[in-house]
């Protein structure tokens, strides 16, 4: 069925665990109720998802590192009747729950990078459809082994990395060991692999010397890879892949062979995309799926290679009526040797209004970085201020919240 780090779980292990859940008191009347899962062991999460889905229950996934009190509050807000925290035997019953007449669903909170996290609900029937069309679009051989470095408490690691693999008869390897050398050894010892990771993990893996080793397939998602990291990985990878999606829709598109770090590929069969083809005038990516229209708030355009990402609508900076896309400015700074990381965001000026601000991890003087930008960008795109920092804060999936950076600027 699957492997967690180096521990293998068979079909009989799966069945024994499901039978154990049958006997637990909290699951005797599971149908129609919501359960929150904040668990450390991927095998616990996956087996409970299978079990509760079969019981026609809804499941709220919460990242394993969430403190218990916070996780309980999240479960209460989601109207769950209880939460399993840490281990599958640690169940906390929650009171004052209103009965919900809903189709059994998978529940998740959005990342909150652009504001307060929202509770997203997707029916299990929608998840089943996603798995079916995802496997069709992925067109992966059964003997290609998914190595899942993304958490299974998130739909990317759970649905795309794990459930889709089990459905097509593959045996995924889920990595929770925090040592990047451990993960790299697993990859190197698995000839036909497809690595599921986010840019932060790939950045760490890419920092180790590869020698003559060649990655088979790397799948990235969650945020665009920095341009320099993309080209570095592409040199040692047979197929650089990227999938694009959102909490409301799941996976929307897959790119099988990236030519640029912003390539999102073609839509899955169950999704249709409304978007323009002018690179200089990107539009919001609007997805039609299951008789509903999803406004992603992502900007992009389409070409013969498929979809291309340009940025978040919320992140676009309006400098005296001219639009600045943070990704373009970040890429320019990252092309300067010695700039390790860069994040560009909106600042406020009492007279000028919106301005471009940046934080960088670099030993180079910010004045020199600004001079570099002036040589390669129109003046209105050049950061008004560049701050040198030792760390750029990221959330658990490796995303940076420009909104929080902006709010920090406003309140100081």
UniProtKB/Swiss-Prot annotation:
Gene3D superfamilies: 3.30.300.30, N-terminal domain of ligase-like
Keywords, alphabetical: ATP-binding, Ligase, Nucleotide-binding
Pfam families: AMP-binding, AMP-binding_C
Keyword hit for ATP-binding: yes
Cysteine pairings via disulfide bonds: none
Role, per record: Involved in the biosynthesis of petrobactin, a catecholate siderophore that functions in both iron acquisition and virulence. Catalyzes the adenylation of 3,4-dihydroxybenzoate (3,4-DHBA) to the corresponding AMP ester, followed by the transfer of the activated unit to the phosphopantetheine thiol of the aryl-carrier protein AsbD.
Protein name listed in UniProt: 3,4-dihydroxybenzoate--[aryl-carrier protein] ligase
Protein's organism: Bacillus anthracis
């Amino acid at each position: 069925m699957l492997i967690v780090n180096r521990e293998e779980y068979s079909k009989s292990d799966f069945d024994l665990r499901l039978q154990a859940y049958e006997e637990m008191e909290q699951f005797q009347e599971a149908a129609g109720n919501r359960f929150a899962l904040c668990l450390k062991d991927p095998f616990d999460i996956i087996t409970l998802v299978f079990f509760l889905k079969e019981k026609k229950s809804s499941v709220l996934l919460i990242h394993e590192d969430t403190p218990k009190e916070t996780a309980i509050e999240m479960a209460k807000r989601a109207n769950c009747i209880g939460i399993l925290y840490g281990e599958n035997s640690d169940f906390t019953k929650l009171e004052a729950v209103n009965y919900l007449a809903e189709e059994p669903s998978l529940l998740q909170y959005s990342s909150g990078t652009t504001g307060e996290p929202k509770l997203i609900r997707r029916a299990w029937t929608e998840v089943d459809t996603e798995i079916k069309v995802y496997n069709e679009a992925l067109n992966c051989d059964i003997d290609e082994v998914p190595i899942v470095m993304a958490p299974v408490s998130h739909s990317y690691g759970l649905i795309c990395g794990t459930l889709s693999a089990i459905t097509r008869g593959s045996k995924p390897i889920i990595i929770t060991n925090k040592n990047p050398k451990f993960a790299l050894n697993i990859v190197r010892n698995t000839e036909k692999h497809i690595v599921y990771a986010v840019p932060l993990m790939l950045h760490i893996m890419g920092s180790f010397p590869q020698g003559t080793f060649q990655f088979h397939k790397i799948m990235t998602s969650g945020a665009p890879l920095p341009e320099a990291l993309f080209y570095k990985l592409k040199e040692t990878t047979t197929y650089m892949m990227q999938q694009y999606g959102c909490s409301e829709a799941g996976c929307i598109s897959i790119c099988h062979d990236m030519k640029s770090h912003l390539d999102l590929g073609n839509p899955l069969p169950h999704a249709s995309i409304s978007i323009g083809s002018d690179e200089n005038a990107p539009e919001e990516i609007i997805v039609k799926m299951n008789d509903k229209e999803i406004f992603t708030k992502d900007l992009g355009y389409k070409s013969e290679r498929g979809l291309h990402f340009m940025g978040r609508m919320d992140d676009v900076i309006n400098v005296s009526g001219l639009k600045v896309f943070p990704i373009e400015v970040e890429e320019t700074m990252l092309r300067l040797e010695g700039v390790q990381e860069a994040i560009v965001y909106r600042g406020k000026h009492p007279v000028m209004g919106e301005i471009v601000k940046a934080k960088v991890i670099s030993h180079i003087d910010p004045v020199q970085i600004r001079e570099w930008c002036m040589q390669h960008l129109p003046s209105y795109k050049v950061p008004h201020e560049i701050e040198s920092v030792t760390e750029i804060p990221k959330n658990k999936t490796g995303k940076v919240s420009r909104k929080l950076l902006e709010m920090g600027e406003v309140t100081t």
